From Swiss-Prot:
Function: Aquaglyceroporins form homotetrameric transmembrane channels, with each monomer independently mediating glycerol and water transport across the plasma membrane along their osmotic gradient. Could also be permeable to urea. Among aquaglyceroporins, it exhibits a unique pH-gated glycerol transport activity, being more active at acidic pH. It most likely plays a central role in the efflux of glycerol formed during triglyceride hydrolysis in adipocytes and in glycerol uptake by enterocytes, as both processes occur and are stimulated at acidic pH.
Residue ranges annotated as motif NPA 1: 82-84
UniProt-recorded name of the protein: Aquaporin-10
Compartments in which it is found: Apical cell membrane; Cell membrane; Lipid droplet
Tissue localization of expression: Detected in epithelial cells on villi in the ileum, and also in stomach, jejunum, colon, rectum, white adipose tissue and placenta (at protein level). Expressed in duodenum and jejunum. Highest expression in absorptive epithelial cells at the tips of villi in the jejunum. Detected in subcutaneous adipose tissue.
Catalytic function, reaction form: glycerol(in) = glycerol(out); H2O(in) = H2O(out); urea(in) = urea(out)
Subunit structure: Homotetramer; each monomer provides an independent glycerol/water pore.
Organism: Homo sapiens (Human)
Amino acid sequence: MVFTQAPAEIMGHLRIRSLLARQCLAEFLGVFVLMLLTQGAVAQAVTSGETKGNFFTMFLAGSLAVTIAIYVGGNVSGAHLNPAFSLAMCIVGRLPWVKLPIYILVQLLSAFCASGATYVLYHDALQNYTGGNLTVTGPKETASIFATYPAPYLSLNNGFLDQVLGTGMLIVGLLAILDRRNKGVPAGLEPVVVGMLILALGLSMGANCGIPLNPARDLGPRLFTYVAGWGPEVFSAGNGWWWVPVVAPLVGATVGTATYQLLVALHHPEGPEPAQDLVSAQHKASELETPASAQMLECKL
């Protein structure tokens, strides 16, 4: 009897009671899954000379990765996976502003770590493809496996607009999916529909710079490549492109949130919502599981 109870007791000691800590762990794992699968698809295509992957397979893998990542952490952290979406959730009141920098830090750290995992996984393939010469530009460049870079014709102004518009479309779509006063999505299928949204964006807006739309997805891997052997050119390439996929998605998230709220959400009839959205349900469940003292601490945070 003692032996059968031991695993349960151990699990009880390991269980984390803090809501914020659980959210951080779930967000870290979700971003890690997203990045490893997305970068793996790109690495497979690039290092094989596109004999084992292409433009379509990269975006398909990325959309499926988003779906899986949301299932991983959706009911714990909300599976934001993206500082731009976290910002949108703060704007609409679904995430406390005080948690925004914490979410962003976790997302950046996870993207950095996932890039390291991708590098280790494809280390031999990278060495074979490049001959040990890791470059940011040129016919054998491999930096784009990890971070995004603009097409040769793309100006910074057009690239900035690309990211504002693309992220705005992303946020409009996500808010519509989560809006129970609108058409809505059957419970549990939200991740699938979000994956379809990502695929549509990739296939329609991916040519200019690969639709980063996510500051953590771009900056975390870029920092990794800087320290892993690609050097400072990861920041100077594309006329100093690096800041565009960091700043523009945040602008796009603000624009997209304001657009959906002003044109759709604000005009719903007054009254209770038909059903709780994924994030609200998660918070309610967390409150029921969290002791009163922990809830007080959460409020202070």
